[in-house]
Amino acid sequence: MGALGRALLWLQLCALARAAYKLWVPTTDFEAAANWSQNRTPCAGAVVQFPADKAVSVVVRASHGFSDMLLPRDGEFVLASGAGFGAADAGRDPDCGAGAPALFLDPDRFSWHDPRLWRSGDAARGLFSVDAERVPCRHDDVVFPPDASFRVGLGPGARPARVRSVQVLGQTFTRDEDLAAFLASRAGRLRFHGPGALRVGPGACADPSGCVCGDAEVQPWICAALLQPLGGRCPPAACPDALRPEGQCCDLCGAIVSLTHGPTFDIERYRARLLRAFLPQYPGLQAAVSKVRRRPGPHTEVQVVLAETGPQPGGAGRLARALLADVAEHGEALGVLSATARESGAPVGDGSAAGPLGSGSRAGLAGGVAAGLLLLLLALAAGLLLLRRAPRLRWTKRERLVATPVEAPLGFSNPVFDVAGSVGPVPRTPQPPPAQQAGSSSTSRSYFVNPLFAEAEA
C-alpha cells in the first residue's frame, strides 16, 4: 500500500473513530502565578514555602534566588535547561518588600470532575457543551500537557472515570493494565491522587448519530465542583421559566430542541449545518448538540440547546422555530423523524414534518385551556341557578311573615268589679304570646274578673 492509500485509510479510521479530545488546563509549574498566594511568582530574596504534607511535581523553567525556602516532604522539581535555585539576600529586589512569605497553594485543589479545568480540543466558535460533557466522556481521548507539571484528584472512588485513552508524559495508554502500572509508579502517584480510579476503553464512538457521554452518574460531583466557588448554589436565571437541559447543572435562558432520529442521521453533519446555516443569523446565541437519554425510558434523542448570551432575548425561540421549520422541510434528508421544542418563558410553536413536532407543548397548552373553560362554565351555571332561586326564597319568607297576624287581646279591665280597697287601675292580666294563643283551644279569649264569685269561693 502506497503513501496515498495509507493516508486515505487513516482518514477513514479517523472518520469512524469520531473521538473528541479533552485537554487538562491547570498546571503546578513554578512560574504559574495562579499557584502562589500572592498571585505572582516569588521575587528575589523572598521566603518561599511549599505545603509540607503534600506530594507535588513542579516544573521550574528559570533561575530563582530566595532568602529561605521550605520544601515538601514528598515531591520533585523538574528543572529545565538553565533553571535552578540560589540564595539571595532579603530585600535585594526593591519591589519585593518585606511582606508575608510566598506560599505555594494546595496542589490537591484540582479535581477531575471540575468542568472549569478542561478544554475541548475540537471546540468551534458558537458551540458549547453542557456541564456534564465538559468533563471527559467515556469515548474521549484525554491529553495532559507533556511539558508541564500537574496534579489531578480522581474523586471519591464510587465510580471510576472511564475514557478512551490517556496521554501523559509522552505516553498514550489504551489498556487498563498499562495505565494501572503507571498510576502505581512514583510518577503516577505524584500526578494522580485520591481514592478514585481511572480506566480506559471501550473505544471511540462508532455510531454516526453520536453516543451518550456517560457522565450522568457522576453529575452530582461535577455540579458540586462547578458550584463550589458559589457556595454550592446556582445563580438565579435572568428569565422566567428557565430551562435545565440534560447534563446541565443550573437553569439557563434559551430553548431546547429535541430530535428523534432514524438510522441515517449524522450528528456531525447536523452540527455543521447548524453552525454554518443558522447560527450566523442569530448573534448572541450558543448551541450545544449531543445525544442524551430520553426520560423516562432507555431510548435516546439528540438534544439541541440554544443558550442566550446576548443582551436581547428572544433569539433562541426564533432559532428554535427555524429549526422546526427546517425539519418539516428537510427532515427526511437529514434523517430526523420528529422534533419538539420548548422555550424559556413561553412555549415554542411548531409545524408538522415526518412526525409530530412540538405536540407535547401544544397538547399541554390546549388541555389547560379546555380545563379552564370547563371550570368557568360550571361556575357560571351554579351562579345563575343561585340567582334564580334567591328571589323565590325571599318572597316565600315574606309571605309566611305576613300570613301570621299578631292578634290583639280581647279582654278588658272593668273598674266596677275591681276588688274594694284597691287604688288605681287594676293591672291588666298579661296576655300569652300569639303562638301560644293560637295553639290553645281550652282557654277563652273573652273573660273578666267577678269579685262576687271570688268572695263566695273564698
Curated annotation (Swiss-Prot):
Keywords of this entry: Cell membrane, Coated pit, Disulfide bond, Endosome, Glycoprotein, Membrane, Protein transport, Secreted, Signal, Transmembrane, Transmembrane helix, Transport
InterPro entries attached to this UniProt entry: AMN
Subcellular compartments: Apical cell membrane; Cell membrane; Endosome membrane; Membrane, Coated pit
GO annotations of cellular component type: apical plasma membrane; clathrin-coated pit; endocytic vesicle; endosome membrane; extracellular region
Main location: membrane
Start and end residues of each VWFC domain: 203-254
Domain of life, per lineage: Eukaryota
Cysteine pairs bridged by disulfides in the record: C43-C96, C137-C213, C205-C211, C223-C249, C234-C250, C239-C253
Function: Membrane-bound component of the endocytic receptor formed by AMN and CUBN. Required for normal CUBN glycosylation and trafficking to the cell surface. The complex formed by AMN and CUBN is required for efficient absorption of vitamin B12. Required for normal CUBN-mediated protein transport in the kidney.
Organism of derivation: Canis lupus familiaris
Membrane topology label: Single-pass type I membrane protein
Name recorded for this polypeptide: Protein amnionless
Residue ranges, annotated region (Interaction with CUBN): 67-87
Post-translational modification comment from the UniProt entry: N-glycosylated.
